[in-house]
A protein has these predicted regions:
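C-terminal and inter-domain tail/linker signature
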Residues: 1-148
């Protein structure tokens, strides 16, 4: 019988490897069937002002990005670990409206019992709009609505 006061401790390298695999395999949509290997059922995703919860939330978040970018690819460029958290700098690549797009992003993943329980992510949305040639329209819209 397992001691209830004993917990499995993973080192920073294994947490970083899990975070990298989750981003490159699951978040790209290539291995959605393996999401339970990386994400807790209690998972909460805070991404670009949106919030997704649970394993279904992972699926919905990935579906959002795969609709925006066909042939989605996620490549982790750099990682930092601290205790139960891993920060990953990544690039999303794919096609949108027939144009190749590369979007920089950062995710901070918090682990519990070897699984990701929470992510905080931001991506360079303005950079994506510039690459698609629609950023001026976005700025006009923001001015119209008094955001600028």
């Amino acid at each position: 019988m397992k001691n209830p006061f004993e917990c499995e401790v993973q080192d920073g390298k294994s947490l970083a490897a899990s975070a990298k695999d989750a981003l490159e395999r699951v978040c790209s949509g290539k291995a959605l069937d393996s999401l339970t290997r990386y994400y807790s059922p209690k998972f909460v995703d805070h991404v670009n002002g949106m919030k997704f919860q649970g394993l279904d939330g992972v699926r919905r978040s990935v579906e959002l990005y795969t609709k925006i970018l066909s042939d989605l690819d996620v490549v982790v460029k750099e990682q930092l670990t601290d205790s139960d958290r891993v920060t990953s700098r990544f690039v999303l690549s794919g096609k949108s409206f027939g144009k190749s797009v590369h979007i920089n992003g950062i995710t901070i993943s918090r682990f519990q019992d070897g699984l990701i329980v929470e992510d905080w992510s931001v991506t360079d949305t303005l950079g994506m709009l510039r690459q698609l040639g629609v950023w001026r329209s976005a700025l006009v819209g923001l001015r119209h609505w008094k955001f600028l």
